[in-house]
């Protein structure tokens, strides 16, 4: 009686586990490509937080040079990052996740010895410039895992608007008059009159560049989303030809008098209160001893990337080329740049060495009966993905966005779920025999 109850419980539990396993059914290549294209359509709209493509408007005759400049510099940054990773054979991500990180704080140096603030004569109404000296960390440049820029937004009761969208840019060294002068990093919508708060931005790529090329450290620029007009974040509405000043105020950057009203005693008290809120960088680095202890001669698996897959005819799991033309494949005209991109996808068989546990005929039979569409073998899935930068229009307004995980660069065979299923089956079976 006890054994029957246990068997029923085992079957119910295995049914639940099997049904929860991801399926990996075989598809012909044409069908797979069609599904991949539709998945990309959904991905782009979802990442842009759109429920449907924007309405089609006539394409602008000429995109403003400053917009093209930001798009090109952001795109080039991603390409440089990919090239560095490929050329340097970066350490496996598992090392970065496993080892403890050493954290370093680098404060923004004061503009003047007596007061870390911009005096009225240097006041810039539309943007702020922030610089850091990271030269002390250059010797550990290869150990950098992450860098964050943190700045404290102060309450500004004098603000004329309740909220603004501020953007962070890396200032670039101009090679000539046509080269870009800044590179977009990130943006945030802030409440100008609300209580103060810390704002954090991921600036890993910028700091990595500074550590390797000291002459490129020109700092960051905090500016408005649309300084030549007025941008309303709540409804994304733009009022043209009405310049908007940066109403957000930042500790250690803006002079106390620009956001505080009152006598000298009040101003001094406010300055003291914000003295420990200087803009700073937080650098997270792998400790040197952790790197030295690693075995440098570990055998690495062959990468199933373009370098291997595109020059070999493979039936097994490999990277497959797929170019998406936005107009032809998706019927979209609202993405201005690029016209398309190499999305790629993973497909092919994954040879599997069956263990004695998983080879058990009863295990296979039960697994296939419970979920006939599930694959007992590993699936060919993406391993490395890269972002895509797009320049698109909503109405007549140009926007630049970076979409994460849009380009498949390499593939792998996922670990089979059948092994876990078999272990669960045998553990319950052994429990039943003991009973």
Curated annotation (Swiss-Prot):
Pfam families the UniProt entry points to: TGF_beta, TGFb_propeptide
UniProt keyword list: Cleavage on pair of basic residues, Disulfide bond, Extracellular matrix, Glycoprotein, Growth factor, Mitogen, Secreted, Signal
A single GO BP: neutrophil chemotaxis
Signal sequence interval, chain numbering: 1-20
InterPro entries: Cystine-knot_cytokine, TGF-b_C, TGF-b_propeptide, TGF-beta, TGF-beta-rel, TGFb2, TGFb_CS
CDD domains on file: TGF_beta_TGFB2 (cd19385)
One GO CC term, this protein: extracellular space
Residues with attached carbohydrate: 72, 140, 241
SMART domains listed in its UniProt record: TGFB
Top-rank taxon: Eukaryota
Disulphide linkage map: 309-318, 317-380, 346-411, 350-413
GO molecular function per UniProt: amyloid-beta binding; cytokine activity; growth factor activity; protein homodimerization activity; signaling receptor binding; transforming growth factor beta receptor binding; type II transforming growth factor beta receptor binding; type III transforming growth factor beta receptor binding
Assembly with partners or alone: Interacts with the serine proteases, HTRA1 and HTRA3. Interacts with ASPN. Interacts with MFAP5.
Family membership: Belongs to the TGF-beta family.
Protein name: Transforming growth factor beta-2 proprotein
Organism encoding this protein: Sus scrofa (Pig)
